From Swiss-Prot:
Alphabetical list of SUPFAM superfamilies matching this protein: Protein kinase-like (PK-like)
CC per GO annotation: cytoplasm; cytosol; meiotic spindle; nucleoplasm; nucleus; synapse
Protein name in the entry: Ribosomal protein S6 kinase alpha-2
InterPro entries tied to this protein: AGC-kinase_C (IPR000961), Kinase-like_dom_sf (IPR011009), Pkinase_C (IPR017892), Prot_kinase_dom (IPR000719), Protein_kinase_ATP_BS (IPR017441), Ribosomal_S6_kinase_II (IPR016239), RSK3_STKc (IPR042766), RSK_N (IPR041906)
Lineage per the UniProt record: Eukaryota, Metazoa, Chordata, Craniata, Vertebrata
Organism annotation: Homo sapiens (Human)
Protein encoded by which gene: RPS6KA2
Main localization, broad class: nucleus
UniProt tissue specificity: Widely expressed with higher expression in lung, skeletal muscle, brain, uterus, ovary, thyroid and prostate.
Binding residues annotated for ATP, in chain numbering: 65-73, 91, 421-429, 444
Protein kinase domain segment(s): 59-318, 415-672
Domain spans labelled AGC-kinase C-terminal: 319-388
Keyword Glycoprotein among record annotations: no
CDD domains: STKc_RSK3_C (cd14178), STKc_RSK_N (cd05582)
């Protein structure tokens, strides 16, 4: 990272620290200049005749996602109706604590959400009320918000930013076409779904029914994102959203806000008069777009003209975007959040999710509470229509997933621990039984004082949906140990099964190698290296012994490629943002994975290991053989094995990692491509204990060699810990 990027990264640390610290303090004031004094909330009905309204009894509370003076946001599961089993976010507002300002915000949010229908805007499914409370049932977005990702990774690549801004531009244009000014654009209000697409939320500060000729005058939003015309209260239109769009772009690209003083007064002065310092590490197209958005005269701002969003879409920064494909969500997001099962809440603040979800009865503000909030009930039209089986996504009822951050439920409350399966230097693996369902799992118990499990958990959550990667079910943290609950591998270790198998041929060896190499190619393409791909970490899911049941396990030493600033890199953008030595190390680690697969393939074919004769070989002897790159490819089984097999083995075990095959090259090798023509004849094998002992000796010798310094997760740094406070709050005057 060059000096200018480091400067912005440091500014980002303190920026995030300050805004997180301020999140707990409510600085919102209200002077409803546009709306006047509101005595009654009048919201027209949107419920179609003949369809049953929703009520609180139809929702099972699972977790608390957020909480404020207004009420709570819960993760809930619908337990009745055609969408039973579906997960939602339920926003609960207490009528008695809603001031006039809050009632207007609730009215505005509910009205707008009921009106809009867009792929990049959060959807309102139900709205209803009881005597004391208002309920909004919304999409549950498992990926958390953009602020969480930005605060962890400091800044994004231009390709990442281009994707997020493009989806956001379509969402804002849709709101503007309905006469709505959003007015609170910031990373906290941009959510990510499980695939990584955005959805904007929180319409409490939005202004409805504004056309291009009418202006709004409220002083509202989040100071750092306010347009100059909002700050000086001379009236604003939809153009104010494009200024905020520019602030968000600047923040994502640099990790810093463009205008931020030591207090609100200084920040407002900077917005009105300060000259923007343009970071020179940004591309010319990015700088051009920022300058076009940061026009203090809103009439000159990009997006404010008669063509609206088309001006932005035509800008050279977005030249690679196919807008129709983007709208259909056919462009793959640059970042996929680490999510596991549907009810996982890893990306939500553990301060809230650790709380017991309870919805206490609300006290009505007055005897005419229902009159004040009349017409609040709503049912989405998509729920009124008879859903097809394809549209209905029934979520099975699972126990609540416990977060890495810990809570008041201990692992043994839900599971019964059984015998050991395996023991490592920093963890032990045991069989366990889920008490409620009597289902068997494996639990990996990690000593936190010896190893930080964060990287392993993130990788398993992000990539564990692959059919040949072990699936993570639950995560518990009791402060001293972390418990990773995973599917139980009933088929045992790959090498055990192969060596004990009565018949095992060259053709079967190619099938096995193909399955594992496809898995590694997938991981390597995502910037993930396993780094501990020994045969004992490759197991069968069941007793079938089929290649499809193979699982790659134990990601304790795995790493995800990251830039120097901690940014999790996606495959397309590494060249410009990752230091050469990091790329070199990543390539070396990937080559080590292939070398380990070469060891496995050699053993499957020859019936013995290439560099160790038995468990009594010393580490020095084994390392000397590995260093020389000499091993037998003649005699024994090798005399009946194809030349293609010998070729792929030699290229996977090449002593120079730069000349070793990649995973993709292995998959394209004729021995793998044409495996149906390979010999089905049985291969001879040595004693299983002798081979396993030699394999263990090989990896023991390798593990004795000096290791590169272990990099701690970004969030464990002192600077990152100082950031972990609170977020910016919105203001309305």
């Amino acid at each position: 990272m060059d000096l200018s990027m480091k400067k912005f990264a440091v500014r980002r640390f303190f920026s995030v620290y300050l805004r997180r610290k301020s999140r707990s303090k409510s600085s919102s004031l209200s002077r409803l200049e546009e709306e006047g004094v509101v005595k009654e909330i009048d919201i027209s009905h949107h419920v179609k005749e003949g369809f049953e309204k929703a009520d609180p009894s139809q929702f099972e509370l699972l977790k608390v996602l957020g909480q404020g003076s207004y009420g709570k946001v819960f993760l809930v599961r619908k337990v009745k109706g055609s969408d039973a089993g579906q997960l939602y976010a339920m926003k609960v507002l207490k009528k008695a604590t809603l001031k006039v300002r809050d009632r207007v915000r609730s009215k505005m949010e509910r009205d707008i959400l009921a009106e809009v229908n867009h792929p990049f805007i959060v959807k309102l499914h139900y709205a209803f009320q009881t005597e004391g409370k208002l309920y909004l049932i919304l999409d549950f977005l498992r990926g958390g918000d953009l602020f969480t990702r930005l605060s962890k990774e400091v800044m994004f690549t231009e390709e990442d930013v281009k994707f997020y801004l493009a989806e956001l531009a379509l969402a804002l244009d849709h709101l503007h076409s309905l006469g709505i000014i959003y007015r609170d654009l910031k990373p906290e209000n941009i959510l990510l779904d499980e695939e990584g697409h955005i959805k904007i939320t929180d319409f409490g500060l939005s202004k409805e029914a504004i056309d291009h000729d009418k202006r709004a005058y409220s002083f509202c939003g989040t100071i750092e994102y306010m347009a100059p015309e909002v700050v000086n209260r001379r009236g604003h239109t939809q153009s104010a959203d494009w200024w905020s769009f520019g602030v968000l772009m600047f923040e994502m690209l640099t990790g810093s806000l463009p205008f931020q003083g030591k207090d609100r007064k200084e920040t407002m002065a900077l917005i009105l008069k300060a000259k923007l310092g343009m970071p020179q590490f940004l591309s010319g197209e990015a700088q051009s777009l920022l300058r076009a958005l940061f026009k203090r005269n809103p009439c000159n701002r990009l997006g404010a003209g008669i063509d609206g969003v088309e001006e932005i879409k035509r800008h050279p920064f977005f030249v690679t975007i196919d807008w129709n494909t983007l709208y259909r969500k056919e462009i793959k997001p640059p970042f996929k959040p680490a999510v596991g099962r549907p009810e996982d809440t890893f990306h939500f603040d553990p301060e809230f999710t650790a709380r017991t979800p309870t919805d206490s009865p609300g006290v009505p503000p007055s005897a005419n509470a229902h009159h004040l909030f009349r017409g609040f009930s709503f049912v989405a039209s998509s729920l009124i229509q008879e859903p097809s089986q394809q549209d209905l996504h029934k979520v099975p009822v699972h126990p609540i997933v416990q977060q890495l951050h810990g809570n008041n439920i201990h692992f043994t409350d839900g599971y019964e621990i059984k015998e050991d399966i395996g023991v490592g230097s920093y963890s032990v693996c045991k069989r366990c039984v889920h008490k409620a369902t009597d289902t068997e799992y494996a639990v990996k118990i990690i000593d936190k004082s010896k190893r930080d499990p964060s990287e392993e958990i993130e990788i398993l959550l992000r990539y564990g949906q692959h059919p040949n990667i072990i699936t993570l079910k639950d995560v518990y943290d009791d402060g001293k140990f972390v418990y990773l609950v995973m599917e139980l591998m009933r088929g045992g270790e790959l090498l055990d099964r192969i060596l004990r198998q009565r018949y095992f041929s060259e053709r079967e060896a190619s099938d096995v190698l193909c399955t594992i190499t496809k898995t590694m190619d997938y991981l390597h393409s995502q910037g993930v290296v396993h780094r501990d791909l020994k045969p004992s970490n490759i197991l069968y899911r069941d007793e079938s012994g089929s290649p499809e049941s193979i699982r790659v396990c134990d990601f304790g030493f795995a790493k995800q490629l990251r830039a120097g600033n901690g940014l999790l890199m996606t495959p397309c953008y590494t060249a410009n943002f990752v230091a050469p030595e990091v790329l070199k190390r990543q390539g070396y680690d990937a080559a080590c994975d292939i070398w380990s697969l070469g060891i496995l393939l050699y053993t499957m074919l020859a019936g013995f290991t290439p560099f160790a004769n038995g468990p009594d070989d010393t580490p020095e002897e084994i390392l000397a053989r590995i260093g020389s790159g000499k091993y037998a490819l003649s005699g024994g089984n090798w005399d009946s094995i194809s030349d293609a097999a010998k070729d792929v083995v030699s290229k996977m075990l090449h002593v120079d990692p730069h000349q070793r095959l990649t995973a993709m090259q292995v998959l394209k090798h004729p021995w793998v491509v044409n495996r149906e023509y390979l010999s089905p004849n049985q291969l001879s094998r040595q004693d299983v204990h002798l081979v396993k002992g030699a394999m263990a000796a090989t990896y023991f010798a390798l593990n004795r060699t000096p290791q590169a310094p272990r990099l701690e997760p970004v969030l464990s740094s002192n600077l990152a810990q100082r950031r972990g406070m609170k977020r910016l709050t919105s203001t309305r005057l």
